[in-house]
């Protein structure tokens, strides 16, 4: 496994919708492993492929609970319910945090590393992290959804 360089804003790859994954091969498995390692070393809870310069619909999420690592390939949100408002940051925007409204519950359809379709239900922080990463895959940045920015001392 390798730690990848995280793309910082501004960069065109962050604002470009990603291509769907067609080839479920060893290159994809390596990308997933490298992304997960990169996310953990950077102390993140999610990482999307465009954040490492790869314009594919691939994301990894791990919020540090017993859900563990979630790999999302070609994900789409089928259902959203409720709302939550809270702080978000992004590894591509170091030191920038803002308040963002997200659905509190989501149901997602995605594929695993072998191409098998699965459904996932999530709520709370996990739902927030997944929505943030899926936005990345469509070229949507969290800064476009911020209702107010936080000073660093507000987050302590």
Curated annotation (Swiss-Prot):
Coiled coil: none annotated. Fe cation binds at residues 90, 132, 136. Its EC number is 3.5.1.88. Keywords: Hydrolase, Iron, Metal-binding, Protein biosynthesis. Binds 1 Fe(2+) ion. It comes from the Bacteria. Its cofactor is Fe(2+). It catalyses: N-terminal N-formyl-L-methionyl-[peptide] + H2O = N-terminal L-methionyl-[peptide] + formate. The active site is at 133. It holds the Pfam family Pep_deformylase. One of its GO terms (biological process) is co-translational protein modification. Belongs to the polypeptide deformylase family. Removes the formyl group from the N-terminal Met of newly synthesized proteins. Requires at least a dipeptide for an efficient rate of reaction. N-terminal L-methionine is a prerequisite for activity but the enzyme has broad specificity at other positions. NCBIfam families: pept_deformyl, PRK00150.1-3. PANTHER family: PEPTIDE DEFORMYLASE. This is Peptide deformylase 1. The gene is def1.
């Amino acid at each position: 496994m390798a730690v990848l360089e995280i793309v910082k804003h501004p960069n065109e790859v962050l604002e470009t919708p990603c291509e769907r994954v067609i080839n479920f091969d060893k290159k994809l498995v390596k990308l997933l492993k490298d992304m997960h390692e990169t996310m953990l070393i950077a102390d993140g809870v999610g990482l999307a492929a465009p954040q490492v310069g790869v314009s594919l619909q691939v994301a990894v999420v791990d919020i540090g609970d017993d859900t563990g690592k979630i790999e999302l390939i070609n994900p789409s949100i089928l259902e959203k319910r409720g709302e939550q408002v809270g702080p978000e940051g992004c590894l591509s925007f170091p030191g920038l945090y803002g308040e963002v409204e997200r659905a509190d519950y989501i149901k997602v359809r995605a594929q695993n590393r072998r191409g098998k379709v699965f459904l996932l239900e999530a709520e709370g922080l996990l739902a927030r992290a997944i929505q943030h990463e899926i936005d990345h895959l469509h070229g949507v940045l969290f800064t476009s959804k911020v209702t107010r920015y936080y000073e660093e001392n507000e987050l302590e």
